[in-house]
Amino acid sequence: MARQPRLDAPGALHHIIGRGIERTNIFRTDQDRDDFLNRLANQCLEKNIVVYAWSLLSNHFHLLVRTGRYPLSEVMKKLLTGYVVNFNLRHKRTGHLFQNRYKSIICEDDPYLLELTRYIHLNPLRAGLVGSLKELGYYRWSGHSAIM
């Protein structure tokens, strides 16, 4: 059965989730995380997208983005393909890294935007990567620390 095409429109708000195959780590080192975030920042500039929230955990990531004039699929293809190529070179491996294709859910601006931003930014706390909200304020791999 063929996959349904993704819903997208210029200016759409998307909650994006990407997971490692069999929940394996897609971020092994800080260099991996830095590479992913640098690539995301480049896509923001090149493709005119806005990132409202992001969180990188060891085996998955969450993004909350508003697309610009380019389709989300074009943005994510460049982000994820470039990331996987470098990840595989760094870690001397081959093959796929992500489980299936990324999940994207179109969201309404109000009232869901604020709630979803909170959900994404609190993910490291719920996962036990940090022990408190105060520690989350210093956690480099979530947008929470960038806006606090």
Give the role of each language-model region:
Residues 1-148:
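Short catalytic/metal-binding and nucleic-acid-binding patches
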